[in-house]
Each structure stands twice: as structure tokens, then as C-alpha cells.
């Protein structure tokens, strides 16, 4: 029997929210707001929260709390929620990341996870004095990073000799509580990203897309993973606008786009499209994104979780039917909308899942 679809939310630990727009956002990046949000999300049925990693300002993100630190703070404020801390190879070494995350796992009863971000913002790397590798080299480094994490977390006297990282007879103690290790997430949509996920990652995040577009990615990565004898779960980005009527929801979307900051949207679009264009296939997560799509950082409008609770629940169950395991959601007004989602959307999703299971059992 298939598992219920899981839900995660983007932690707003970076100022400016998740849309590049001057629309009012009743969301704050400060720690008090985020602690309360984590508690609301936990009560509302969310299993995961994903913290963001940024080092420099840009596209409205003038202030940024560091991801591992805020992840620990949110875990301390909750009891069941898992928090996924975003980490960049380069600024982090696998030795440091393994030690930090193992310690947090011990302190929180096994509730930390990691999102290994290969990097998309060239200016940020230059600003902090980190080398900017070519596209596929970034993913090669990330794969070594993940292999090193797994080795450190699961072996004593770990040795590893890669092109980017080396370990000689290293033993980490204490190791994480989670067995075999904390869950490892990654994102991307290039061939290099999918290939890496099919070999080493537990979870693969993809940008928002149509059902058909998501299915093509799911089928491709699952086939690659099967060929490698590996299992990987799929998470999809979605910007959720749930309102009592579809007209209200569509009006909110229209206002977000109408109040978009053109300079910031175009600057962000140029940065991410250049990063993707450096891949051998000349594409990436945002290759086909329009101006309207780019107003939301991760193409979240494309997933179309916009409408009434019933409409959104039906679309979520349709995504589950094509192999999606998790919805990574963003909101305009996080606290109130996460609570609304938990009260009005999530119960409908569970009802529809139960109906589908019953129908399969009868058939």
C-alpha cells in the first residue's frame, strides 16, 4: 500500500518571502515568527520544513539567517517536525557538515535532514571568495560530498579519496541517531542533477511544473535509479494559494504578478538561466520559465495548487498518482495560510487518498 503523500514548507529565514513582488506579505524572517510558524505547521500536519541557504543580498533577500543554526532553533521549538538544513559544498566541508548534523540529530531525537545545494548564484560564491565550478563539476563535487557524509555517518575508520574530498581512517563519534543516517535531499533538473540523485540521494526536489512535465522527470529519475539499484523519493515545489473561491485565489495570483519587481525578476532570471545554460544540455530548472513563472523563485505557480481546498486537494492526489512523494510548499502569508491549509486542504487530501486506496482494494 502506498504511503500518504508528505508535506513540507519553505522556512522563511530569508527576508522578502518567496515571491519577487511588492505585494503585501504577512511573513517575517525573524526567529520568533519562524518558531511560531514551525509549531503551527507541526500541528497542521506538515512533516518537514526546509530552511534556505543564502550568504548575500539580492532579489529582495536583504537579510538571511544561516540555515543550520535556524534549523536547530526550529527543532528545539517542536516535537515531531523534521527540519531539512540546506548546505552548500564549498562553504561547508563534509567533515564539518557531518559533525554539525550528527550533533543536532543527537540533541533532537533524530529529526534533522540535509539538503545538499550544488549552487546556482555565481555572484554569491565570488562575494565570499569561493571558487565557482562549472555546472557538471558542481554536481560531481556534491556527489562526493554526499558519499563522504554517508561514509562518515555509517562507518568507523572511514577512508575516501576523491577529486574534491579526502579522508584517512576517520571515525566520527557520536554518530547520528537516525539509521542508517539522516535523510539526504537535493534539487536540480539538469541531467547531471538527475543522475546524481539516481545514485546517492534519498530525495530529489524538482521545480514546479505541469503534471505532464513532472511525470516526465519522475519517470526518468526512477528509471535511472532502478538501473543503479537505488531508491529515491520525489518532492515537488508548489506555491499554494488556497482560498474559499477560485476567483479569490486567482485574484491573489494576478496581484502578485502585477506587483512584481521587474528589475529583480529579470536579474534573478538571468542568474539562474545562465547557471542552467552552463550544463551540457544547455538547460536547467528555469530554462523554460516565463517572467510570470520567475516571480516565484522555484516555478511554484506552474504546479497550479491555486484555487479552492477541494481543487488543490484533487491536484495533490493527481501528483501522488504519478509518483510524487512530497509537496514542498510556499505561501504568501505563511502562518495564517499554513494553518488554513492544515484545516481545509490536508484533511481533503487524506480523504481522497483513502478513497483511492479503497477503490484499488475493491478492484
Curated annotation (Swiss-Prot):
It catalyses: dimethyl sulfone + FMNH2 + O2 = methanesulfinate + FMN + formaldehyde + H2O + 2 H(+). Its EC number is 1.14.14.35. GO terms for biological process: alkanesulfonate catabolic process. Pfam families: Bac_luciferase (PF00296). The keyword Oxidoreductase applies. Disruption phenotype: Cells lacking this gene are unable to grow on dimethyl sulfide (DMS), dimethylsulfone (DMSO2) and diethyl sulphone (DESO2). Transmembrane segments: none annotated. It is an enzyme of class 1 (oxidoreductase). One of its GO terms (molecular function) is alkanesulfonate monooxygenase activity. Belongs to the SsuD family. This is FMNH(2)-dependent dimethylsulfone monooxygenase. Keywords: Flavoprotein, FMN, Monooxygenase, Oxidoreductase. InterPro entries: DMSO2_SphG (IPR024014), Luciferase-like_dom (IPR011251), Luciferase-like_sf (IPR036661), SsuD_RutA_monooxygenase (IPR050172). The keyword Signal does not apply. PANTHER family: ALKANESULFONATE MONOOXYGENASE, ALKANESULFONATE MONOOXYGENASE-RELATED. Involved in the dimethyl sulfide degradation pathway. Catalyzes the oxidation of dimethylsulfone (DMSO2) to yield methanesulfinate, which is oxidized spontaneously to methanesulfonate in the presence of dioxygen and FMNH(2). Induction: Transcriptionally activated by SfnR.
